[in-house]
Design a protein with these regions (language model features):
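Charged, often flexible domain-edge or linker segments that flank or initiate folded functional domains
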Residues: 1-241
């Protein structure tokens, strides 16, 4: 509208939104005439779009150089874009002791006609998983992905059926007796559409361990340069952290 506008905000996200709605439209609304090439003389797309695309690609390439090895491409060209983890505790039944993944539900995708979930099963006294649903093995008729191993703070062992109350679970966490487990990998195939999934394997765990080691190396290097820990360690009492 051409109005002289002033605004301020402490929140960086809100500040960016204000700049995008009040400043950038006036600054970048005009196009830029192309100086060379077959479209010489035509007006290019918005300057801001060009800048975002240019620097976005730069950030992507720099990230690939530094951490690309932690996202190894699968044989079909799919690239890992996410990992699904679960916190774990040991079954408190002395005759069992199985590792229980703490999950309130097993859905991986539940949108439109796409219904994909993890399916837990027991093999040699251990909880294993496979992918079932749209595009995968058929989902068993008697399986309900909405029901995980945890319901209303009560944990049920998939191996022996024993239950653990919420207070006992909290105590195990406080005592440092809880663990974690990588369950599945979320993948994107540049030639395909949408996300796909597979169960995590030993290679995925190995790559994660390598990333952990690299993080510690990077952390030490930055600590030496900055004189402070780059990983936030302030207590968060309201979040019980």
């Amino acid at each position: 509208l051409g109005c002289e506008t002033y605004a301020s905000d402490y929140n960086p996200v809100a500040t960016l939104i204000l700049k995008c709605t009040l400043e950038y439209p006036q600054r970048y609304a005009r196009g830029e005439e192309l100086k060379e090439g077959p479209l010489r003389g035509d007006v290019s797309k918005n300057l801001l779009v060009q800048d975002v695309e240019r620097w976005g690609n730069w950030v992507l390439e720099e990230a690939r150089k530094e951490i690309g090895r932690f996202y190894p491409v699968d044989e079909d060209g799919s690239i890992p874009v996410g990992y699904i983890w679960a916190r774990t505790i040991k079954c408190q039944n002395p005759a069992c002791g199985a590792e229980i993944p703490l999950m309130t539900q097993f859905w991986l995708a539940k949108k439109g006609d796409k219904r994909v979930s993890l399916y837990p099963y027991v093999a040699d006294g251990k909880v294993e998983f496979k992918i079932v649903g749209t595009g995968y093995e058929e989902m068993p008729k008697d399986f309900n992905p909405d029901k995980g191993t945890v319901h209303k703070a009560i944990t049920r062992c998939p191996v022996c059926g024993s239950v653990i109350d919420g207070k006992s679970v909290s105590r195990l966490f406080r005592e440092g007796k809880a663990g974690q487990r990588m369950i599945a990998v979320v993948l994107h195939n540049p030639k395909g559409k949408g996300k796909t999934y597979r169960v995590a394997n030993e290679k995925d765990i190995s790559v994660f361990r390598e990333a952990e080691r690299y993080l510690e190396e990077k952390r030490k290097k930055l600590f030496d340069e900055w004189g402070m820990d780059p990983v936030p360690d302030e207590p968060t009492p309201e979040g019980k952290g």
